[in-house]
């Protein structure tokens, strides 16, 4: 249960209260039982944990940001993992909807790795050298176009995920980005440098906040 209101008023302890109208916001995350069982078995064999719990990454990000930024009623969470990106839409302190697309930080490195026929670690090293301004002219010449390609592919999928919310007519202005430290700025800039006006009511650029250890 994310929130509960009685007669339009939000309450944390509704027990014993009387009301004419009850509204409950409930978030459910589902997964096939066989998938859960396989993951549970693998984790148990390796780590020997007494208790293993499963939760939604998007929901965890939402709860954390809601507590850290209590004045932000509505916002978008972009959580970039190794293989996937979660996009969460929060409205009025409630997780409204979530979407996942198969592009994460490793997708960037694979684009370079496959194009240059090098291993993934080498591709990561070259990508970070270019992003940090320490690459040679030759490396910039070969890697920069591939980084642009990876950015274009990621932005395209992010744009498509936003288009799923257009019918709601109220895409939030604030975007929180959670990403691996080495590519955090890269993902933030990927959103900042693109135009998503067609998805917003205000026709303003997104206010993109990179969430890190200093936040």
Regions from the language model: what does each represent?
Residues 128, 195-200:
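A common structural junction motif
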Residues 172-177, 206-208:
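Hydrophobic beta-strand segments of well-ordered beta-sheets in folded domains
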Residues 66-97, 112:
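Gly/Thr-rich phosphate-binding beta-strand-loop-beta motif of the actin/hexokinase/Hsp70
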